[in-house]
């Protein structure tokens, strides 16, 4: 509905240009907002005030002119001027009802799909030398939610799990794997079941034994030279490490697969060419033996130009080099229209520099959008980055185990007579959903406090509340199994029916914001408001005990669309729904 009003206003502006009211080259930014006070209509715009200077007219006069020139629309019941020149639109109830009716049988819930694009999404991307920890949670689940929403809206999405599968640390790890196998044979495989312990043990050997450190450095050289033995060890290590990652992905309900892995090592063959191409364009400068690029727009507080280091003095490459190679691949091979990077906000400067350099060096097409969608940190209740009681890094699998344990206690307390298998399944969904939703419901760019107590509450904007809200709506149909709705029509008469209908009609607008800005918290807020709107509707408007069949059937259709929207919205967040709790 919002996009429809924007379209009407765009047509009006074009008419003004043709009439000479506005300059022919004038470009207007049209903003349409939902009103908070329904006495002021459903939607409003301040367009008249924005056009005053260009049109040379006062805002109220211009507002009336806009209304007089608006194309006719069955969706608009009336239009009014308010205050200094706001234009308020009142949506026609029957047109809204027809829109909702059509949405019920549509797999996209009545959402008009945008022009499809090819969108590469770089997310999760853990280092394979260690197990996934809580620091990987935000990139993984925020990225996955945006990916799901992009696909639902018809875009071609290419997932890229840019894992850290290369670097000098692998010499140390391979040397330790080699040593363990010499001592214990294939039993050494068991040591890798705990990657953190394996990594610490390898690091200790590296620090304490000069002979071991020499062997580790030798293995790095041999690995980078393509040695078959080293590459075999490296592939085995990566395979075990990736298995750990995908166990976590499966538990989290994340859609990444092995086929989506395109790690740092995938770009090794192109790194030397990146350096040569930058040098050929005269962009490289020598600085203390390293090859760097200075860009005038990036300076420190003292006004000194900040370098992008492309190659170290010892010949080694850096993240920037790999990122440039990846951008070139994503532009020339994957033909991306947009590339989205879900990486910690602390990497903002790095991405600003490499995005700018990729464009400057023509490694990417000018029409390809490069977007760093950064996020804040997940903190403990002391406001500091989330740690174990001993100050260590919290493994993601341990966090999920605790969530499951706490959820099981919660579900059992509310269902003391439920069988253990059902309790366990409900607890699994509630526990994982609580962790994911607590994160996704926060503004992506904000830090947030992790609290099991808050996230497992049945009150407020939480996963348990929304899961219960869905079961409550779906439960209506368990008591209405013999009712035929094939010929039923939605009729909006009661104020709460209209409020619910208006909220349902906003789903498409919300999803557009999710994919345009990479902000799943907007969808979380919408689903919470939708659940509240349904609760108000259900209290004020009897469904199965309605006054007549026409009213009952209409309210059942509204309930059905609410259930469909809640379920789809939660699914786009990567959250399963339950039929009972």
Swiss-Prot record:
It is an enzyme of class 6 (ligase). It catalyses: tRNA(Arg) + L-arginine + ATP = L-arginyl-tRNA(Arg) + AMP + diphosphate. Gene3D superfamilies: Arginyl tRNA synthetase N-terminal domain, HUPs, Isoleucyl-tRNA Synthetase, Domain 1. A motif ('HIGH' region) lies at residues 126-136. The keyword Lipid metabolism does not apply. InterPro entries: aa-tRNA-synth_I_CS (IPR001412), Arg-tRNA-ligase (IPR001278), Arg-tRNA-synth_N (IPR005148), Arg-tRNA-synth_N_sf (IPR036695), ArgRS_core (IPR035684), DALR_anticod-bd (IPR008909), Rossmann-like_a/b/a_fold (IPR014729), tRNAsynth_Ia_anticodon-bd (IPR009080). Keywords: Aminoacyl-tRNA synthetase, ATP-binding, Cytoplasm, Ligase, Nucleotide-binding, Protein biosynthesis. Its EC number is 6.1.1.19. SMART domains: Arg_tRNA_synt_N, DALR_1. One of its GO terms (molecular function) is ATP binding. Its main location: cytoplasm. SUPFAM superfamilies: Anticodon-binding domain of a subclass of class I aminoacyl-tRNA synthetases, Arginyl-tRNA synthetase (ArgRS), N-terminal 'additional' domain, Nucleotidylyl transferase. GO terms for biological process: arginyl-tRNA aminoacylation. It is found in: Cytoplasm. Pfam families: Arg_tRNA_synt_N, DALR_1, tRNA-synt_1d. One of its GO terms (cellular component) is cytoplasm. HAMAP family: Arg_tRNA_synth. Belongs to the class-I aminoacyl-tRNA synthetase family. Monomer. This is Arginine--tRNA ligase. The lineage of its organism: Bacteria, Pseudomonadati, Pseudomonadota, Gammaproteobacteria, Alteromonadales.
């Amino acid at each position: 509905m919002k996009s429809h009003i924007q379209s009407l206003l765009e047509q009006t502006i074009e008419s003004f240009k043709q009439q000479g009211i506005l300059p022919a080259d004038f470009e207007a930014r049209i903003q349409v907002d939902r009103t908070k006070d329904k006495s002021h209509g459903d939607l409003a715009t301040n367009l008249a005030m924005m056009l005053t200077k260009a049109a040379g007219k006062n805002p109220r006069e211009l507002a009336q002119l806009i209304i007089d020139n608006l194309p006719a629309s069955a969706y608009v019941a009336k239009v009014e001027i308010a205050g200094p020149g706001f234009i308020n639109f009142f949506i026609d109830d029957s047109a809204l009802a027809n829109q909702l009716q059509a949405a019920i049988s549509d797999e996209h819930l009545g959402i008009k799909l945008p022009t499809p694009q090819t969108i590469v999404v770089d997310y999760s991307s853990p280092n394979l030398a260690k197990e996934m920890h809580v620091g990987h949670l935000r990139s993984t689940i925020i990225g996955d939610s945006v990916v799901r929403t992009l696909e639902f809206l018809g875009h071609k999405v290419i997932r890229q799990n840019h894992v850290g599968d290369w670097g000098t640390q692998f010499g140390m790890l391979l040397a330790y794997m080699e040593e363990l196998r010499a001592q214990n044979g294939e039993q050494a495989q068991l040591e890798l079941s705990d990657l953190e312990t394996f990594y610490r043990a390898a690091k200790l050997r590296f620090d304490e034994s000069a002979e071991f450190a020499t062997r580790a450095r030798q293995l790095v050289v041999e690995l980078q030279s393509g040695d078959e033995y080293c590459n075999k060890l490296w592939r085995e290590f990566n395979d075990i490490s990736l298995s750990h990652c995908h166990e976590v992905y499966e538990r989290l309900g994340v859609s990444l697969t092995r086929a989506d892995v395109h790690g740092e090592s995938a770009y090794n063959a192109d790194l030397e060419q990146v350096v040569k191409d930058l040098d050929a364009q005269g962009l490289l400068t020598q600085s203390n033996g390293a090859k760097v690029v200075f860009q005038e727009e990036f300076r420190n507080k003292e006004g000194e130009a900040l370098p992008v280091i492309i190659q170290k003095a010892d010949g080694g490459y850096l993240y920037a080099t790999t990122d440039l190679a990846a951008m070139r691949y994503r532009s020339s091979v994957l033909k991306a229209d947009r590339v989205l990077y879900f990486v910690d906000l602390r990497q903002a400067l790095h991405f600003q520099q490499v995005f700018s350099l990729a464009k400057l060096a023509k490694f990417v097409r000018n029409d390809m959008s490069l977007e760093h969608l950064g996020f804040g940190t997940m903190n403990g209740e002391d406001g500091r980055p989330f740690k174990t009681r001993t100050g260590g890094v919290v493994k993601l699998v341990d966090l999920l185990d605790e969530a499951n344990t706490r959820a099981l206690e919660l579900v059992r307390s509310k269902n003391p007579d439920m069988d253990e298998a059902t309790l366990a399944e409900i607890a699994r969904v509630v526990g994982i959903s609580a962790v994911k939703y607590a994160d996704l419901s926060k503004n992506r760019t904000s830090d947030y406090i992790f609290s099991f107590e808050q996230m497992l509450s049945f009150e407020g904007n939480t996963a348990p509340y929304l899961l219960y809200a869905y079961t409550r709506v779906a439960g209506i149909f368990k008591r209405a199994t013999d009712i035929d709705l094939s010929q039923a029509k939605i009729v909006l008469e009661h104020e709460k029916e209209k409020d619910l209908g208006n909220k349902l009609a906003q789903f498409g607008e919300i999803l557009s914001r999710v994919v345009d800005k990479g902000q799943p918290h907007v969808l979380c807020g919408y689903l919470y408001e939708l659940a509240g709107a349904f609760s108000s509707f259900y209290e004020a408007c009897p469904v199965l005990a309605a006054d007549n069949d026409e009213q009952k059937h209409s309210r059942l259709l509204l309930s059905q669309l609410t259930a469909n929207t809640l379920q789809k919205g939660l699914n786009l967040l990567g959250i399963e729904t339950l039929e009972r709790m």
